[in-house]
Amino acid sequence: MEKFLKYEIKVNNNQPTNTNPNYGIFEVAPLESGFGITIGNAMRRVLLSCIPGASVFAIAISGVKQEFSNVEGVLEDVTEMVLNFKQLVVRISDLLFEDGEMIEPPLERWPVLKVTAEKKGAVYAKDLECPAGFEVINKDLYLFSLQKDMKLTVSVYVKQGRGFTSFLENRELINSLGIIATDANFSPVLHCGYEVQEVKTSKQKLTDHLTFKIATNGAIKAVDAFAMAAKILIEHLNPIVSVNESIKNLTIIQEKAEERKVKSFAKQIEELDFTVRTFNCLKRSGIHTLQELLSKSLTDIREIRNLGKKSEREIIKKVQELGLKFRS
């Protein structure tokens, strides 16, 4: 069968000065015509909905029973406080996971991020105390302000997941009064767009140039999210390929002819499966790679000491099998 083009990936090619790991531009080319949209659409859907992340799913504020209330001495009402806490970006260590899922203990033993404010002034995410394995990324996030010296404790419950869960679903995890369930948006990918450009490579040949632009919330690097999306797709498609073992082992993508040629030239003569006598003769004459062999003319080959007619024929046959020629 006709092989598909082997493509290359360039990272941040258009912005060489970009050092923000939360943003990335990824160029994939050359792709067969039509594959830009096929790959782009599949990757975008996975990036926006399937990359795992962490999110706040419940909050407890000392002295507060439900979210539609006020706390004396606090600038914000409870609803505003909840909205602020929902913007927390948290990373959870892989050490707290087993088989890809967080081990979820009862809520009373759940790891809690906690802040206790006692003096008048603003409270930020950096003031949160985190349990082992939890890290707040956006430490400058404003949470609330005390209008006088007083003591207020806020406990924040965070879990790992994919996609989105509503406060109704999260409320099922809560078994005590005074804990307010919230919606949870787990996706660490804030934006993912792609663009496909047609590139004319010959009079009759068009290829696709696919460009992704990805932005994350900092819990995962853009390049890691990009790779994770591809991994998720591959893992879902592999079982389908396994339906037919002969197709499973089929080579679908092939390098360009000139790339294969360059790689062939770099081959050591040990890789060409010559007989011991032929191999030793070539080594003694200072020929170590295929490129060095092809730099010789047929006359040069025949003049190699102790080569013999049989070894000469073996070398000529091997070069012909590779579709290559000696120097004329």
UniProtKB/Swiss-Prot annotation:
- SMART domains given in the database record: RPOLD
Q: Which reaction does it catalyse?
A: RNA(n) + a ribonucleoside 5'-triphosphate = RNA(n+1) + diphosphate
Write out the ranges of the annotated region (Alpha N-terminal domain (alpha-NTD)). 1-244
**What do the Gene Ontology cellular component annotations say?**
cytoplasm; DNA-directed RNA polymerase complex
Does the keyword Calcium feature in the UniProt annotation?
no
Give the E.C. number(s): 2.7.7.6
Described by its record, this protein's role is as follows: DNA-dependent RNA polymerase catalyzes the transcription of DNA into RNA using the four ribonucleoside triphosphates as substrates.
Q: What is this protein called?
A: DNA-directed RNA polymerase subunit alpha
Q: Which organism is it from?
A: Mycoplasma genitalium (strain ATCC 33530 / DSM 19775 / NCTC 10195 / G37) (Mycoplasmoides genitalium)
Q: What does UniProt list as this organism's lineage?
A: Bacteria, Bacillati, Mycoplasmatota, Mycoplasmoidales, Mycoplasmoidaceae
